Amino acid sequence: MQPDFPQQGKLIPPQSSSSNQRPAALKPPRLVLDNIFAFPPNRETLGGTAYLIVENAVNFLIDCPAWNVTNEQFLRDKGGVSFLLITHRGAMARAREIQETTGCQILIQEQEAYLLPGLDVTGFQYDILTPCGVAIWTPGHSPGSSCLYYNSLGGVLFSGRHLLPNPQGELAPLRTSKTFHWQRQIQSVQSLIDRFTPTTLQFICPGANTGFLRGRGFVDRAYERLAALDLKAQAS
């Protein structure tokens, strides 16, 4: 059963302005696939993109969107949030406020659960079955980096920062100054290739760099693109 939202008065009011200029309108989430919405990049998570899967009985939030009136009202209008999966330690901004407002259950890989003290958190070790599919531990970007596999629409992988589009719009693991363990990240990519097939993985929704997708909002032919990666060259 989905948790009820608190009363309307719990919403964070928009900030007042002493100037005569009207504040710029905040962009609402946009539909990218059938029942999947992408939120605008969140400055508090260094430009991370959060997603909402809207189901009949369960709404599933992947990573934390910017917490403002526009996004809160959008979630209310869609029926609330039952689960929030945090795919890595850099995607948890405002997790407390989101849980307090929506009553959602938070899922996170167990190595990073300690970063959310005082919250109702379910940690998992390798995989955890959810109402929308399977959360999969994919260490490398961070110790507890994970992805969500949504077993609908031909298979959709929400990859967090484990797999991202590069400036050419091509999907790849990207090594950054924040990468925890590059070799483990490469191994985790290989584990996804071994786990899926062209018929079970059609799309990937990355957790950042979505501007490089040139408005598409997702990566199609997902398994084909994964299998074509030269992981040996990237590992060297």
Where are these regions (language model features)?
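Metallo-beta-lactamase
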Residues: 2-21, 28, 59-61, 134-137, ...
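Short, flexible loop segments at the rims of nucleotide/cofactor-binding pockets, characterized by
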Residues: 37-42, 60-65, 82-86, 134-138, ...
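Structural signal for conserved beta-strand scaffold positions within catalytic alpha/beta enzyme cores
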Residues: 38, 86, 108, 122-123, ...
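A short, polar/proline- and glycine-enriched secondary-structure boundary/capping micro-motif
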Residues: 50, 71-75, 167-172
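Active-site HxH/HxHxD metal-binding segment of metal-dependent hydrolases
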Residues: 66-132, 221-230
